[in-house]
């Protein structure tokens, strides 16, 4: 299939229509039904971003709440060590919940489907929001910690559900662009949490429980809207054998009556699945055709978290303060705005430049910026302009993250696997993401204490390593169906078994589908 773009298109809508029109000879539309379904799904991504960023701004106030509550109960103030440990637990237990939730993705999606799973787990969001929102009234530190654990479980599940659902309902030529919307939801959630966390909005001593409990509202909104969204047609046909329903949903989502080629691809995959036993987590590592894609998936997730991005956002206020910024919270919000803008840019680029290229550009830019951050922090006391260099390096660091390492690892996992192993793969990849997230949050303060400005050199080393791995090991998936990608890995695994060599270079040499002339 050779495609080549012609005509001028402006705006996000025009860009998406341009991509869609290149899928097949007949014209497809970006339908309201497709946009609505993806938008509703990304509310789960928003929840993940919001609850990741919401705990940072009210840190001092929440510590005071913990101190006062424990003092009133014990008639004596807690030790500084206990206070610090309880605060750290309140932050870190969110990631523990995320690890458990992400590893449980397959238990839900195979039993209830993609859409219904998103609907059911909103009960966790409501429960976690209530626990956190009422902890001050109840004078209970335990409710705060338990609420963070429950909302972490919810967010961990969402990190598997949302990319999987979006990938399965999106046309092949739009899969990357729409997959990026998952990351856009996350960064908007982080930005909203930063803004709401300002003392003049919800970050005050009186309103911080409302700030934490706000997560109930998106859960209610998504629960009301999800029944209007279709189930994944791939799930209906491949897992439930409901071909007629799947065909009807594809026609409505993609705006065309001719979906026979896509239905046939799903039927072929379904036939192959019926000859295989159910894929477990262990099978992903035992079967040669799954082993390489799961390793790629894990490393790409690690490249996101070990890039240092969460260290920047978790401790951004302190970093800006160390850099000499008088109002560091506003500088942190500026980083959140940059985060959002460049995620939108990635939406435009991912189907043109490709996943692999953008990921390498992002990693390379971040490696340079993390080195520059180290230099500027070391020299800021000697040269006045170094504070501005540090801020600039952080903003460009964030921009590079959102070009590649931010959005791509989430949706590329769904692309690398067929319907059978996909839930298990999403669980493993998501758990590796949350685990590395937890370790960065746990270890970064100590590393920063002992290493000072040199701490970001550690991330530079990781970034260079991940850049090399992406160059040598990660294939390009742009413009390829799930079936194409699966067969390529299977053929590569068989070739590697026969030759005794790693066939990954063959995958890297596979060129994505080129464009053919179409008029929009």
UniProtKB/Swiss-Prot annotation:
Residues 51-88, 139-148, 199-207, 315-328, 380-392, 445-451 are extracellular. GO terms for cellular component: aggresome; nucleus; plasma membrane. The chain crosses the membrane at residues 30-50, 89-109, 118-138, 149-169, 178-198, 208-228, 294-314, 329-349, 359-379, 393-413, 424-444, 452-472. It comes from the Eukaryota. It is found in: Cell membrane. D-glucose binds at residues 183, 304-305, 310, 339, 402, 410. Residues 493-520 are annotated as: Disordered. One of its GO terms (biological process) is D-glucose transmembrane transport. Glycans are attached at residue 67. Mainly expressed in testis. Also expressed in small intestine, liver and kidney. Its main location: membrane. Keywords: Cell membrane, Developmental protein, Differentiation, Glycoprotein, Membrane, Spermatogenesis, Sugar transport, Transmembrane, Transmembrane helix, Transport. GO terms for molecular function: D-glucose transmembrane transporter activity; dehydroascorbic acid transmembrane transporter activity. Residues 1-29, 110-117, 170-177, 229-293, 350-358, 414-423, 473-520 are cytoplasmic. InterPro entries: Glc_transpt_3 (IPR002945), GLUT (IPR045263), MFS_dom (IPR020846), MFS_sugar_transport-like (IPR005828), MFS_trans_sf (IPR036259), Sugar/inositol_transpt (IPR003663), Sugar_transporter_CS (IPR005829). PANTHER family: SOLUTE CARRIER FAMILY 2, SOLUTE CARRIER FAMILY 2, FACILITATED GLUCOSE TRANSPORTER MEMBER 14. Hexose transporter that can mediate the transport of glucose and dehydroascorbate across the cell membrane. Belongs to the major facilitator superfamily. Sugar transporter (TC 2.A.1.1) family. Glucose transporter subfamily. NCBIfam families: SP. This is Solute carrier family 2, facilitated glucose transporter member 14. The gene is SLC2A14.
């Amino acid at each position: 299939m050779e495609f080549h773009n012609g005509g001028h298109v402006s705006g996000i809508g025009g860009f998406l229509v341009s991509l869609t029109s290149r899928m097949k000879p007949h014209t497809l539309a970006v339908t309201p039904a497709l946009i609505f379904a993806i938008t509703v799904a990304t509310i789960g991504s928003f929840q993940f971003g919001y609850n990741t960023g919401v705990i940072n701004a009210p840190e001092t106030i929440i510590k005071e709440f913990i101190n006062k509550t424990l003092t009133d109960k014990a008639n004596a103030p807690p030790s500084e060590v206990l206070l610090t440990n309880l605060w750290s637990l309140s932050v870190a237990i969110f990631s523990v919940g995320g690890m458990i939730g992400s590893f449980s993705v397959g238990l839900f999606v195979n039993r209830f489907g993609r859409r219904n799973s998103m609907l059911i787990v909103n009960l966790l969001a409501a429960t976690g929001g209530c626990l956190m929102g009422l902890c001050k009234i109840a004078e209970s530190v335990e409710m705060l910690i338990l609420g963070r654990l429950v909302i972490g479980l919810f967010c961990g599940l969402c990190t598997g559900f949302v990319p999987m659902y979006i990938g399965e309902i999106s046309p092949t030529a739009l899969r990357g662009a729409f997959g990026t919307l998952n990351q856009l939801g996350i960064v908007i959630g982080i930005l909203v949490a930063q803004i709401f966390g300002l003392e003049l909005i919800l970050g005050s001593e009186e309103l911080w429980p409302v700030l934490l409990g706000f997560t109930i509202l998106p859960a209610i909104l998504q629960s009301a809207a999800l029944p209007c969204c279709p189930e994944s047609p791939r799930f209906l046909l491949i897992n439930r054998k409901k071909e007629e329903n799947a065909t009807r949903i594809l026609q409505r989502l993609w705006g065309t009556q001719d979906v026979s080629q896509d239905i046939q691809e799903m039927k072929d995959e379904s036939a192959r699945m019926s000859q295989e036993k159910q894929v477990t987590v262990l099978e992903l590592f035992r079967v040669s055709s799954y082993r390489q894609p799961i390793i790629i998936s894990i490393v790409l997730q690690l490249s996101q978290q070990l890039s240092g991005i969460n260290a920047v956002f978790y401790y951004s206020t302190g970093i800006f303060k160390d850099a000499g910024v008088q109002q560091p919270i506003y500088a942190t919000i500026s980083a959140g705005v940059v985060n959002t803008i460049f995620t939108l840019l990635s939406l435009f680029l991912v189907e043109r430049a490709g996943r692999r290229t953008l990921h390498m550009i992002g990693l390379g830019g971040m490696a340079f910026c993390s080195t520059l951050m180290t230099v500027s922090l070391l020299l800021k006391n000697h040269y006045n302009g170094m504070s501005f260099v540090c801020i600039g390096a952080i903003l460009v660091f964030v921009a590079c993250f959102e070009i590649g390492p931010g959005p791509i690892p989430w949706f590329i996992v769904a692309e690398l696997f067929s319907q059978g192993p996909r839930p298990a793969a999403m669980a493993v990849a998501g758990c590796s993401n949350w685990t590395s997230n937890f370790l960065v949050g746990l270890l970064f303060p100590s590393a920063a204490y002992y290493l000072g400005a040199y701490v970001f050199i550690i991330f530079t080393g990781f970034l260079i390593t991940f850049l090399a791995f992406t160059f040598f090991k990660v294939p390009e998936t742009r413009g390829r169906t799930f079936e194409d990608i699966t067969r390529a890995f299977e053929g590569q695994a068989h070739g590697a078994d026969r030759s005794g060599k790693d066939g990954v270079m063959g995958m890297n040499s596979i060129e994505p589908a080129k464009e053919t002339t179409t008029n929009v």
